[in-house]
């Protein structure tokens, strides 16, 4: 098997696992036993929509890190991307489990989100490792801000969702700092604006679909 074919097969396997297999977390879910509160129908619907958006974000994170791990030629940086991907995999598992508990479904457009994020990750990776790391920094900072807004919007009684989102927010901030420390280049203002616009489109659509 050629290296290129091996890489392609691994990428396809990762996509299928992310989109169709039940995710398994390597860390314990941060929810606290005994804090569960009965939510109203409206509160469950709101939490379900917000957690669906967060689940989409984790689908995209798997795609981004997979693409960047494929494109880098630096073994240490590849290990960095894969380690971050494993933590994002925990987020994927936690958000999916919480969706099930809330009686909500994942986004119907997850294959589209994955494909788009994988393409962006490939593009960033082709522009060089420092650009790729800069893309990680900006992505994670935007995700951190987005999660902070969800902590303000989630029902006060939804302790489980709030605990998950709070842990995710902390992890995303650390991922951004790790990428910055690894030598990330800052993204130009137009690129940041385009990323924000794309994120708004995704989150608005995923809220309903």
Swiss-Prot record:
GO cellular component, one term: plasma membrane
E.C. designation(s): 1.14.99.60
Enzyme class, UniProt record, top EC level: oxidoreductase
Chief localization: membrane
Any one GO molecular-function label of the UniProt entry: 3-demethoxyubiquinol 3-hydroxylase activity
PANTHER family in the record: 5-DEMETHOXYUBIQUINONE HYDROXYLASE, MITOCHONDRIAL, COENZYME Q10 BIOSYNTHESIS PROTEIN 7
Entry's family note: Belongs to the COQ7 family.
Protein name: 3-demethoxyubiquinol 3-hydroxylase
